[in-house]
């Protein structure tokens, strides 16, 4: 099956039937060729209804979950967005079609290098890709309107919430004792508001509880 057919099937059978109907959002997905961001050995997995795993901690979220994230936070053109977990640059590029400025951080050196190569190859100019441990973020001094964590965390992402502007939004999957759900965090003057949205699952991206390796 051709990649263009796979993409059409993804939009018409994964996104639209699940209430992803914002035409700007659909258009952002239509403009990006996922196969351009996959290593050769992963080409046959383009647009599948599942996560595409490069390694234990590096992956591309399944299209529906990423689309749900964007449908919830509603990116606007003037937003400066932080993406955590670049996944080779595919989700980064979808975001780049929706807002003026995207910062993407990646802690796996191989995937960071792949993302840099893919962003340059596809001539995307409104993206900055940074190599950083997700739990430290020492290189980031900016504050953001919105933050997208492309995977699951196992505790409230306090270090990332600190990077939000007041009234900013953070979206992620939070693993709790007996369930895993999409949560929306809204930054307030005194702390943050935490809203459970819906059940969802993905691999762990940020492990706040156990010691975590930083892959140079």
Language model features with spans:
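Class I SAM-dependent transferase core
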Residues: 1-83, 90-94, 98, 111-125, ...
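Catalytic, metal-anchored helix/loop core of enzyme active sites in primary metabolism
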Residues: 216
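Conserved nucleotide-cofactor-binding alpha/beta core module
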Residues: 74-193
């Amino acid at each position: 099956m051709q990649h263009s057919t796979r993409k059409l099937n993804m939009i018409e059978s994964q996104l639209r039937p699940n209430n992803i109907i914002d035409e700007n959002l659909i258009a952002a997905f239509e403009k990006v060729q996922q196969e351009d961001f996959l290593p050769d050995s992963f080409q046959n997995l383009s647009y599948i209804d599942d996560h595409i795993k490069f390694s234990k901690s590096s992956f591309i979220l399944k299209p529906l979950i990423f689309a749900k994230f964007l449908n919830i936070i509603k990116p606007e053109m003037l937003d400066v967005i932080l993406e955590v977990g670049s996944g080779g640059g595919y989700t980064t590029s979808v975001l780049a079609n929706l807002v003026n400025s995207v910062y993407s951080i990646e802690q796996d050196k191989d995937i960071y290098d792949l993302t840099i190569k893919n962003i340059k190859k596809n001539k995307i100019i409104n993206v900055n890709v940074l190599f950083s441990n997700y739990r430290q973020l020492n290189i980031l001094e900016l504050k953001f309107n919105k933050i997208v964590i492309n995977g699951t965390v196992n505790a409230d992402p306090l270090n990332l919430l600190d990077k939000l502007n007041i009234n900013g939004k953070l979206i992620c999957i939070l693993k709790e004792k007996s369930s895993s759900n999409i949560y929306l965090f809204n930054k307030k003057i005194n702390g943050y508001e935490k809203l459970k949205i819906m059940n969802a699952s993905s691999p762990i991206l940020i492990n706040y509880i156990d010691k975590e390796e930083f892959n140079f």
